[in-house]
Amino acid sequence: MTRFLFTSESVSAGHPDKIADQISDSILDSILEQDPKARVACETYIKTGIVLIGGEITTTASVNIEKIARNTIQEIGYTHPKMGLDANSCVILSVINQQSPEIQYSINHDSDRTQQGAGDQGSMFGYATNETDVLMPAPITYAHRLIQRKSKLRKNGTLPWLGLDAKSQITFAYDENNKIIHITAVVLSVQHNKNIPLEALREATMEEIIKPVLPQKWLSKQTKFFINSGGTFTIGSPISDCGLTGRKIIVDTYGGMARHGGGSFSGKDPSKVDRSAAYAARYAAKNIVAAGLAERCEIQLAYAIGIANPIAVNIETFGTEKVLHSTLVTLINNFFDFSPHGVIKMLNLARPIYKDTAVYGHFGREQFPWEKIDKVDLLRNSAKI
């Protein structure tokens, strides 16, 4: 019996907000490559024919921001003015200041690097669940996989009529035990050229994108498919919508299945706890679930600006814990260092690894260090299970 429905969405690399995220993280990576201690907060705004880059950057690195932006736009595939953004001819404006000296002092006021303060106040969440192989919620996982499949088929020429812009959305039905029953609805909107009839597009999308991605066990006669349900989608990207860094925070995280502190990720160096603490919380939650200590785990971290350690750590397992809650609290406090310096060291974050995070989600992708499950044995042994 269905207890509730849950829906998550994803967007493609060519979506305007994701163009902005990729530019911001490409600039961050280029700076970190030269200066791992750089302080970067880089925001990007996109509209037809124009890119505006702003923020606060303090670094010894020398980078060509305009060139980085153009190269990123080129790699995404925007190479003609008719697309709304041309890597070669678009206007790129840059308004960059240095980080506030007061904030810089609050972070670095102590000569002991282990006492590096948080760059801001705020709360961050990390989440894991055993309902998928990557210990992520199924709705966001499969929404991302649809978009990844679409991107692959566009790039390899299998579906040459595909455009750069796309959005996916999946609704799952869950039972009273929070277990998946089936998929009730799939929404997929793909930009396309004018040469393909709508019905041919829908058939090809179903056969080449949807069916190879979604597990048959979760599909039924009741599953509804909405492929380009609004009709033709030939005008997209920066022509139809502006783009802005950090506007897809739910797509970037857990698709709404877990709570969110509100801070975005892209364009921020790891001294910003908005980003690094969210990664650390995911790392801890994933290891708790991978160790079999809980079926679902959400960890909240809270910080005060200039203070080295979190002012609050909370763990929620939704009644799925296999050991005492007090044991879980002890384990995460003993085996995970959530101070800003500790997080950067624990996950090796002061390096150029961020551009790849800007599309298809920051979590559930094994190439990132916060996805390691290297503390499983330690946790299990300490919990005596």
UniProtKB/Swiss-Prot annotation:
Its cofactor is Mg(2+); K(+). Gene3D superfamilies: 3.30.300.10. Catalyzes the formation of S-adenosylmethionine (AdoMet) from methionine and ATP. The overall synthetic reaction is composed of two sequential steps, AdoMet formation and the subsequent tripolyphosphate hydrolysis which occurs prior to release of AdoMet from the enzyme. Coiled coil: none annotated. GO terms for molecular function: ATP binding; magnesium ion binding; methionine adenosyltransferase activity. L-methionine binds at E56, Q99, D241, K272. Mg(2+) binds at D17. K(+) binds at E43. Homotetramer; dimer of dimers. Pathway: Amino-acid biosynthesis; S-adenosyl-L-methionine biosynthesis; S-adenosyl-L-methionine from L-methionine: step 1/1. GO terms for biological process: one-carbon metabolic process; S-adenosylmethionine biosynthetic process. The gene is metK. Binds 2 divalent ions per subunit. Binds 1 potassium ion per subunit. Keywords: ATP-binding, Cytoplasm, Magnesium, Metal-binding, Nucleotide-binding, One-carbon metabolism, Potassium, Transferase. The keyword Magnesium applies. CDD domains: S-AdoMet_synt. It is found in: Cytoplasm. Its EC number is 2.5.1.6. Pfam families: S-AdoMet_synt_C, S-AdoMet_synt_M, S-AdoMet_synt_N. Belongs to the AdoMet synthase family. One of its GO terms (cellular component) is cytoplasm. It is an enzyme of class 2 (transferase). Residues 99-109 are annotated as: Flexible loop. Its main location: cytoplasm. This is S-adenosylmethionine synthase. It catalyses: L-methionine + ATP + H2O = S-adenosyl-L-methionine + phosphate + diphosphate.
